[in-house]
Swiss-Prot record:
Purpose of the protein: Specific inhibition of calpain (calcium-dependent cysteine protease). Plays a key role in postmortem tenderization of meat and have been proposed to be involved in muscle protein degradation in living tissue.
Chain intervals with Basic and acidic residues compositional bias: 351-365, 376-387, 448-505, 588-648, 687-713
Domain notes: Each of the four flexible inhibitory domains can inhibit one calcium-bound calpain molecule by occupying both sides of the active site.
Gene name of the record: Cast
Polar residues compositional bias, start-end: 47-64, 120-129, 275-285, 294-304, 326-346, 544-558
Organism encoding this protein: Rattus norvegicus
Protein name as it appears in the record: Calpastatin
Bias type Low complexity, positions: 1-21
Amino acid sequence: MSRPGPKPAASSRPRRGAAASHTQEHVNEKNIGSSSKPAEKKGSDEVTASSAATGTSPRMSTTGAKAVKIESEKSQSSEPPVIHEKKPKGKPKEGSEPQTLPKHASDTGSKHAHKEKALSRSNEQIVSEKSSESKTKFQDAPSADGESVAGGVTVATASDKVVVKKKEKKSLTPTLPMESTLNKLSDKSGVNAALDDLIDTLGECEDTNKDDPPYTGPVVLDPMDSTYLEALGIKEGTIPPEYRKLLEKNEAITGPLPDSPKPMGIDHAIDALSSDFTCSSPTGKQTEKEKSTGESSKAQSAGVTRSAVPPQEKKRKVEEEVMNDQALQALSDSLGTRQPDPQSHLRQAKQVKEAKAKEERQEKCGEDEDTVPAEYRLKPAKDKDGKPLLPEPEETSKCLSESELIGELSADFVQPTYQEKPSMPAAKIKKGVVPDDAVETLARSLGTRKEDPEDEKSLVDKVKEKAKEEDHEKLGEKEETIPPDYRLEIVKDKDGKPLLPKEAEEQLPPLSDDFLLDALSQDFSSPANILSLGFEDAKLSAAVSETVSQVPAPSNHTAAPPPGTERRDKELDDALDELSDSLGQRQPDPDENKPLDDKVKEKIKAEHSEKLGERDDTIPPEYRHLLDNDGKDKPEKPLTKNTEKLGQDQDPIDALSEDLDSCPPTTETSQNTTKEKGKKTSSSKASKNEEKTKDSSKKTEEVPKPKVDEDAT
């Protein structure tokens, strides 16, 4: 409280020198023979803490605090100054400065006598030297800051009474801050307090009058403390050239410094927020109040306010705010004044209106017929002769009268009053004339179809327009172009004569429409009518079997239809008649008459391989005795085989139809189909076994014909 702390403007050179000398002396004293007892360490720590507490006092920003600092510095300057001489690096002087202890140190020693008993004489000398050095530091600090002391004297004139009272009480300065700092340190370090209690139980240390032997070893030096590094910018020679230009620019600026924004209080913040809710008062009264408040504030600023000393926490906050303001001002000074924006005058200039562009109309390609290229012009459609086709006129629908419209709309609800003309019945189609399609009978009621000119052109003509026709001889069209491997070989006999092809079977006569309708509608009619049907020839029955081969016979014959269903039967008959007319006559397929042997011979070669037993030379001697018996030991062949061999010379349908006259026609058709299949298979085997067939034919001539053949003739 009584002594001010060091100012921030003081240079750091004397402090570093004092710190270096202090560390050098402390090392020498330890090497000479300082005791290492815990009681002595305790006393030294307490004295250093007290000296540090008195040396570091917080700064104050109010006028009263400045006056107290200045008066305290004056009282210190009135005391005789202590001259510090540079100590040699050799042995330090013992007991040279025991009398230079400050008054507050002696007062603290009297109050804490029970703690100082544990200190030794050698430890007292170390404490006295440290206290004297701390005193010299405090005396050097105000001497370096003489300008600040001189500036603060003018402020202290307003508080003379306070300064006089403090001069009288200078000799009796209280030691309360020291005690508070010691108590805080003792509270913070609970481990040290526990160690103090243990040390007190040991008792007082015995006084030893014997001096420790002097230290004769080498001098211990700390190279890091002895080196001095100059900070960049302390001297003018260390300032870089780039930063010198900034300093020169700042010196040339003579404008007023910007006012730092003042912190707003709670009342000002409430007034600013509540300004939107309060009603606005008249302007005349407000200006008068502002003038009166301005004059009163000026009058009050002339006098100096006297207030109590703020606590330490508030002092720290005020000092931090002052330092922040000073740092911001220093930064703002380095920036300089704001230069005017070169583009600001352009905004204020008048905008020049440009002349509107002239609109010119340009003709686009394709708007007129002249601008359309010849390649993209529409070509009119032409006939085969090259004449342009005229568009066909659209047929306009005839307007219906009101009565006709009402009749068409009310047809679903009521019988229309307007009756159309009775339509003429369509002419009956003759049975000889057959239409092209059954759908055309329905299309006649829709009207005539318009002919499209494009329909007349065939697809072949369209292809000829784009591609040229070139005749290429295909492989195999002529016998010369067929390769020898793929040429058909003529089938020859054993003698080398070519075999003549078999005569084609007799073609079936074309069937009449009535016969086909009767054959198709036999399932719909009664079974009595089925029995009445008679076939003239056996060949006709085979033709019917080809058309209706897979129709199954009805298992349950229906009874005679009731009389009410006669009309429906007639309608069905008429529909069947129309369908049968659309079918037309059946044309025979030329591929059906070809035997299967021809198809096979086209792909593979017919090679005759001699089989064992065909000649006498090839018969083994073991089986020759069978031929000598002339077939006496052979069993008789069944009649079924003979009947199958007879089918080659005689029509099988004629041979088998006599046994099946009593059966219904459906069974006959199924049996005929099976016989035809057997006929085809037998014909395929006939080419391979030609010699056997000749022998079998000779044997069949000798065998008498059965009774079935006699009945057929």
